[in-house]
From Swiss-Prot:
A molecular-function term among this protein's GO annotations: toxin activity
Task of the protein: Alpha-conopeptides-like may act on postsynaptic membranes, they bind to the nicotinic acetylcholine receptors (nAChR) and thus inhibit them. Has possibly a distinct nAChR binding mode from other alpha-conotoxins, due to a different three residue motif (lacks the Ser-Xaa-Pro motif).
Keyword Secreted: yes
Entry GO terms, CC: extracellular region; host cell postsynaptic membrane
Protein species of origin: Conus pulicarius (Flea-bitten cone)
Record-annotated disulphide pairs: C46-C52, C47-C60
Tissue: Expressed by the salivary gland.
Name assigned to this protein: Alpha-conotoxin-like PuSG1.1
Primary localization class, coarse: secreted
TM region positions: none
Alphabetical list of Pfam families matching this protein: Toxin_8 (PF07365)
Cleavable signal peptide: 1-21
Length: 63
């Protein structure tokens, strides 16, 4: 019986840890903290297109 209780507690702790890590990853993505590589890809796809460049001037600032 003790072994079963130990397994249940271990499983609950593992599940709580796994779901917390997954939700933290989703929160980072939802809050707009995109990696630089994604930002560069969006900019590189948008800036050559005149319509996209006009609608999103913040992405294609002239330097």
């Amino acid at each position: 019986m003790r072994c079963l209780a130990f397994l249940v507690v271990t499983l609950l702790l593992f599940t709580a840890t796994a779901t917390t890590g997954a939700s933290n990853g989703m929160n980072a993505a939802a809050s707009g903290e995109a990696p630089d590589s994604i930002s560069l890809a969006v900019r590189d796809d948008c800036c050559p297109d005149p319509a996209c460049r006009q609608n999103h001037p913040e992405l294609c600032s002239t330097r």
